UniProtKB/Swiss-Prot annotation:
UniProt family annotation: Belongs to the reaction center PufL/M/PsbA/D family.
Species of origin: Alexandrium tamarense
Annotated protein name in UniProt: Photosystem II protein D1
GO molecular function: chlorophyll binding; electron transporter, transferring electrons within the cyclic electron transport pathway of photosynthesis activity; iron ion binding; oxidoreductase activity, acting on diphenols and related substances as donors, oxygen as acceptor
GO terms of biological process kind: photosynthetic electron transport in photosystem II; response to herbicide
Length: 347
């Protein structure tokens, strides 16, 4: 049953009651809600600032050594190489709004735009998740929609907020661009060896497994639609929006898949099936976010990066050794100054 908030519920019926009724009404074509009051301005400011910085921003002194890096289209980048450059290492993790700098140019030079975009974006996306919960609550629905959306939210928060805080500087955050994303991935691998971490492995299983399961489910449903029309008419014509009857035969899909693999590999309960489809990728991404958040503080005890030694103390070459050597190479190339050595090579 709809839990609709109407202006008539407010005594006196004044203009404020009309506004509240409009915000909380579930009859609107586009639901706003209390969280929407925060979501729209925060997300809008983040988008406007990102587009402006991607096109126009001057170079940013990301390393804090007076060697600014250009990321905008105006300074010669393209769609692939362009990015919003993270805040300067000289700023660290300090909150750096525009009024903390002497001039706007100084704020831009120190990468204040990055903090502006990231913090407004995280706030806007968090408000979106809260809006999902609020809308579900007012419609009398279960809260699983917002819970599923928490996976990409915690992943973004881990990369843009937790990791820079743990490393001591927003300059370690992920640049907001295509090539910047890959650069962040390579540096993260070099410094933390995330590919050999079990939480990352669970995340990969969640994402790729979720894609596989969704494709399997969609193909099984599409292949077992109940025909309500003649052979020369599309099956879609026989479907009426909101109909109570099922549109496909889950028993046929269950029987097909059970014989294709084995009986217990398929679901005979639609609710269990769809819960599994939602839970698998969400839990995997949760673990990835947890792995990034722990590595942010250099807590890496679960990593499988130890060399294999036999009983005589001789090294048995393994894939872990190859990855470790590759990590050292990436880390050396990442350091742009010869007087800055990677921690692993420092004596």
């Amino acid at each position: 049953m709809k839990n609709t908030y109407r202006a008539s519920n407010i005594s006196g019926f004044n203009w404020w009651g009309t506004v509240i009724g409009f915000i909380l009404s579930t009859s609107n074509r586009f639901y706003i809600g209390w969280f929407g009051i925060f979501m729209f301005p925060l997300t809008g400011l983040a988008i406007i600032a990102y587009v402006a910085a991607f096109i126009l921003a001057p170079p940013v002194d990301i390393d804090g050594i007076r060697e600014p890096v250009a990321g905008s289209l105006l300074y010669g980048n393209n769609i692939i190489s362009g990015a919003v450059i993270p805040s300067s290492n000289a700023i660290g993790v300090h909150f750096y709004p525009e009024w903390e700098s002497a001039t706007l140019l100084e704020w831009l030079y120190n990468g204040g735009t990055y903090q502006f975009v990231v913090l407004h974006f995280i706030g806007g996306v968090s408000s979106w998740m809260g809006r999902e919960w609020e809308f579900s609550f007012r419609l009398g629905m279960r809260p699983w929609i917002y819970l599923a959306f928490s996976a990409p939210l915690v992943a973004a928060t881990a990369v843009f907020v937790f990791y820079p805080i743990g490393q001591g500087s927003f300059s370690d955050g992920m640049p907001l661009g295509v090539s910047g994303t890959f650069n962040f991935m390579l540096v993260f691998q070099a410094e933390h060896n995330i590919l050999m971490h079990p939480f990352h492995i669970l995340g990969v299983a969640g994402v790729f497994g979720g894609s596989l399961f969704s494709a399997m489910h969609g193909s099984l449903v599409t292949s077992s639609l109940l025909a309500e029309t003649s052979g020369d008419v599309s099956l879609n014509v026989g479907y009426n929006f909101g109909q109570e009857d099922e549109t496909y035969s889950i028993s046929a899909a269950h029987g097909y898949f059970g014989r294709l693999i084995f009986q217990y590999a398929s679901f005979n309960n639609s609710r269990s099936l769809h819960f599994f489809l939602a839970a698998w990728p969400v839990i995997g991404i949760w673990f990835t976010a947890l792995g990034v958040s722990t590595m942010a503080f250099n807590l890496n005890g679960l990593n499988f990066n130890q060399s294999i030694i036999d009983s005589n103390g001789h090294l048995i070459n393994s894939w872990a050794d190859l990855v470790n050597r590759a990590n050292l190479g990436i880390e050396v190339m990442h350091e742009r100054n010869t007087h800055h050595y990677p921690l692993d090579l420092g004596l």
